């Protein structure tokens, strides 16, 4: 039972009722649990939201970041086990989609836990990724990549002191993103819902459709208005789709 468990890996948002479902949110590279703070009270009673706290930021600032998707997935999987007393759905945005996919595989193969669903957002399917590390050549190249994607507070990147604080986590995350893939198209046993913004400069609907190749249990593709961070402006639409799925 997860009642009373205090995990450094998750910020828990409850509704005051015993959970019958859990939604686990996995942030983008450079992101934090705070990105999903507005989701905590967006669902009906009985749905608990777990916003994942990656090391190297916010409450875990003193910890080193993890620079491999597989290693990050190992840690998240282990941390999730006490919360698997009710059905789990994962929502991963950008880097978080890759982490979510790897967590789904580990929960199934190592622990016999099949997710209720996997939502993947703004990230190519694992077997369609190609290594991309040119932005790791130096701090300025990395910062340019982060600015181009959006989603990170400009003040953090422009202020020299704040930049020094966030750079280690950014470098770890973008190393993980850039060195992950390609890999075989290992299927997951739960339905997958892929989402993307129609004006995303990096990911197309065709890219996201490839997730269907690892989703024998069911697949749906949703294209919403917006860019790589469409889910900020389309938050209500995203939450409605998740609520319908969670039941």
Identify the role of each PLM range:
Residues 1-91, 95-247:
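Domain-scale detector for complete catalytic domains at protein termini or as standalone homologs
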């Amino acid at each position: 039972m997860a009642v009373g468990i205090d995990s450094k890996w998750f910020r828990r948002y409850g509704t005051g009722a015993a959970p019958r479902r859990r939604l686990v949110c996995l942030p983008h590279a450079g992101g934090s649990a705070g990105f999903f703070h507005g989701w905590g009270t967006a669902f009906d009673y009985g749905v608990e939201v777990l916003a994942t706290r990656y090391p190297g930021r916010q409450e875990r600032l003193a910890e080193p970041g993890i620079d491999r998707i597989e290693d990050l997935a190992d840690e998240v999987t282990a941390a999730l086990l006490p919360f698997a007393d009710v059905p789990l759905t994962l929502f991963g945005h950008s880097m978080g989609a890759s982490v979510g996919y790897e967590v789904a595989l580990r929960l199934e193969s190592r622990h016999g836990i099949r997710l209720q669903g996997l939502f993947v957002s703004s990230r190519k399917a694992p077997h369609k990724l190609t290594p991309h590390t040119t932005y790791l050549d130096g701090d300025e190249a990395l910062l340019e990549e982060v600015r181009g994607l959006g989603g990170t507070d400009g003040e953090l990147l422009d202020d020299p002191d704040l930049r020094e604080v966030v750079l280690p986590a950014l470098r770890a995350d973008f190393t993980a993103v850039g060195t992950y893939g390609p890999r075989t198209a290992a299927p997951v046993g739960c339905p997958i819902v892929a989402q993307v913004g129609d004006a995303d400069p990096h990911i197309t609907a065709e890219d996201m459709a490839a997730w269907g190749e690892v989703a024998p249990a069911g697949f749906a593709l949703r294209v919403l208005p917006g860019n790589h961070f469409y889910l900020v402006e389309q938050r209500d639409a995203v939450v409605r789709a998740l609520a319908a799925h969670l039941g």
